[in-house]
């Protein structure tokens, strides 16, 4: 019998978002064994169940109220939303926040030896895709008619196999397209992972747990986007040094024993510190510059 007091979260069992989703949950302090073949895993330290399913099942599980939360790519979520609307449904859910992983783009690609004069080049052509609704919305907005060839995998082989004239598929680096004699010609949708919540009344205990998780997720993402920086900086150029390192708060300044010309400076910077920035700090007279990762952060 299902325990309705436990928070149910759906995530991809294996694939593009699986490892990052697992890492996010672990860094939020959820102790759970996700290395087994079980489809439902129970957290050891929180009333949370993790459902490990196919990524294209996650939006439906949330929209139908089977699970409370889902970690899903925006591309899969939007495709399911358009699919349900096309069937006359009114799907409901909340997007709690965009996450900092799973970045990709849904793009049109054509054979490298064919001319490309913009989307109108696809008028009347057959296009292979796993995202027919996103493709249709984009080309309808352009006033372009086309024939759709629905494939659930290996979309990139369609032109060589004579199944389609072009494809619409996810692209990360473009290496797979190149290996199949294709080139990316148009980006139609940019996507990242996101966290969504089912619509409807939520038990107070569950909502409190969701609120706690949201604070932790914010801390994890903020920590990944920030660095802890320590250095010795000349007092006369302190303002210039601080200007190079944007942060949420002012830095901590500490005196150096026996040195009136320099101070020790500690701060959290919200920007990734590149070599160019470190070279500028060095040119201002800073020394002993240390840049450290942050595991957890809460403002």
UniProtKB/Swiss-Prot annotation:
EC annotation from Swiss-Prot or TrEMBL: 2.4.2.17
InterPro entries: ATP-PRT_HisG_long (IPR020621), ATP_PRibTrfase_cat (IPR013820), ATP_PRibTrfase_CS (IPR018198), ATP_PRibTrfase_HisG (IPR001348), HisG_C (IPR013115), N-reg_PII-like_a/b (IPR011322), N-reg_PII/ATP_PRibTrfase_C (IPR015867)
Required cofactor(s): Mg(2+)
Record's subcellular location: Cytoplasm
Principal location: cytoplasm
GO cellular component terms given for this protein: cytoplasm
GO terms, biological process: L-histidine biosynthetic process
Pathway: Amino-acid biosynthesis; L-histidine biosynthesis; L-histidine from 5-phospho-alpha-D-ribose 1-diphosphate: step 1/9
Record-level Gene Ontology MF annotations: ATP binding; ATP phosphoribosyltransferase activity; magnesium ion binding
Documented activity regulation: Feedback inhibited by histidine.
Keywords: Amino-acid biosynthesis, ATP-binding, Cytoplasm, Glycosyltransferase, Histidine biosynthesis, Magnesium, Metal-binding, Nucleotide-binding, Transferase
Quaternary structure, from the entry: Equilibrium between an active dimeric form, an inactive hexameric form and higher aggregates. Interconversion between the various forms is largely reversible and is influenced by the natural substrates and inhibitors of the enzyme.
Similarity comment: Belongs to the ATP phosphoribosyltransferase family. Long subfamily.
Function description: Catalyzes the condensation of ATP and 5-phosphoribose 1-diphosphate to form N'-(5'-phosphoribosyl)-ATP (PR-ATP). Has a crucial role in the pathway because the rate of histidine biosynthesis seems to be controlled primarily by regulation of HisG enzymatic activity.
Protein name according to UniProt: ATP phosphoribosyltransferase
Organism name: Escherichia coli O17:K52:H18 (strain UMN026 / ExPEC)
């Amino acid at each position: 019998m299902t325990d309705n007091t436990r928070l149910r979260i759906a995530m991809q069992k294996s694939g593009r978002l699986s490892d990052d989703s697992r890492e996010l949950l672990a860094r939020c302090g959820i102790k759970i064994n996700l290395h087994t073949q079980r489809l439902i895993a129970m957290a050891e330290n929180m009333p949370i169940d993790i459902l490990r399913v196919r990524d294209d099942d996650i939006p439906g599980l949330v929209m139908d109220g089977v699970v409370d939360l889902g970690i899903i790519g925006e591309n899969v979520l939007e495709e399911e939303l358009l699919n349900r609307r096309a069937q006359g449904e009114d799907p409901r859910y909340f997007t709690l926040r965009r996450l900092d992983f799973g970045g990709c783009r849904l793009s049109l690609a054509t054979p490298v030896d064919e001319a490309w004069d913009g989307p109108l080049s696809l008028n009347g052509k057959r296009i292979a895709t796993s995202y027919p609704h996103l493709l249709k919305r984009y080309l309808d907005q352009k006033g372009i008619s086309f024939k759709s060839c629905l494939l659930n995998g290996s979309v990139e082989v369609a032109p060589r196999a004579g199944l389609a004239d072009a494809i619409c598929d996810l692209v990360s680096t473009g290496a797979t397209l190149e290996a199949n004699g294709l080139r990316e010609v148009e980006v139609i949708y940019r996507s990242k992972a996101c966290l969504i919540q089912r619509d409807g009344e939520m038990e107070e205990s569950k909502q409190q747990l969701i609120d706690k998780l949201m604070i932790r997720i914010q801390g994890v993402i903020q920590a990944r986007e920030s660095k802890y920086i320590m250095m010795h900086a000349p007092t006369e150029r302190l303002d210039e040094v601080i200007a190079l390192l944007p942060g949420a708060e002012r830095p901590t300044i500490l005196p150096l024993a026996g040195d009136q010309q320099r101070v020790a400076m500690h701060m959290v910077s919200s920007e990734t510190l590149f070599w160019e920035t470190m070279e500028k700090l060095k040119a201002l007279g800073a020394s002993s510059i240390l840049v450290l990762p942050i595991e957890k952060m809460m403002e």
